[in-house]
Structures are given as structure tokens and as C-alpha cells.
Design a protein with these regions (language model features):
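Short basic helix-loop element that most often maps to the first helix and adjoining turn
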Residues: 12-30
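Conserved hydrophobic/aromatic packing and binding residues within compact polymer-binding modules
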Residues: 14, 28-29, 39-42, 68
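Hydrophobic micro-packing sites on short alpha-helices
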Residues: 54-58, 68-69
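Short C-terminal boundary/hinge segments that cap the last helix of small helical domains
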Residues: 62-73
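A detector for short, charged/polar N-terminal pre-domain segments
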Residues: 1-9
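Short, basic-rich loop-to-helix N-cap that marks the start of a DNA-contacting helix
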Residues: 46-56
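Recognition helix of helix-turn-helix/homeodomain-like DNA-binding domains
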Residues: 34-47
Length: 73
């Protein structure tokens, strides 16, 4: 699987969980202590996310890191 397709699947999963929790990108960014535009870039697969930020986003969404990883990864 290409690096780009992994980023796309990860971003889709973040968006799916965020929307299911009725959170805006801005609200998630605040909870994760990252910039709002960063969340958008992750969801659109425009940014290569670090492990530290994966953990921040997982914690902000109250999910485990593995929950952010698509089952097909």
C-alpha cells in the first residue's frame, strides 16, 4: 500500500470518528492541542502525521490509536 493511500485511509477514519462524535475540526483541534488547519490537512491526506499527533488525536477522540487505523492497513 502506498504512503498516500495510507494517509487517505487514516484521514477518512479521523473524519468518520470526528463526525460521529459531532465535533467540528476546530473542536477536535482544540481537544488535541493542534491547529485547526492541521486537522483538515490530515483528513484530506495533505500532511504526513507524526506518532505524537496520532496519539493526541486518538486521546481527543477518546479512542485507541488502533481505532484510527483502517482495518485494511
Amino acid at each position: 500500500m502506498s504512503k498516500k493511500s495510507i494517509s487517505i485511509k487514516f484521514g477518512e477514519k479521523v473524519r468518520e470518528i470526528r463526525v460521529s462524535q459531532n465535533l467540528s475540526q476546530e473542536q477536535l483541534a482544540h481537544l488535541a492541542d493542534v491547529h485547526r488547519t492541521y486537522i483538515g490537512m490530515i483528513e484530506r491526506a495533505e500532511k504526513n502525521i507524526t506518532l505524537v499527533n496520532i496519539e493526541k488525536i486518538a486521546n481527543a477522540l477518546n479512542v485507541k490509536i488502533k481505532d484510527l487505523l483502517d482495518d485494511n492497513l
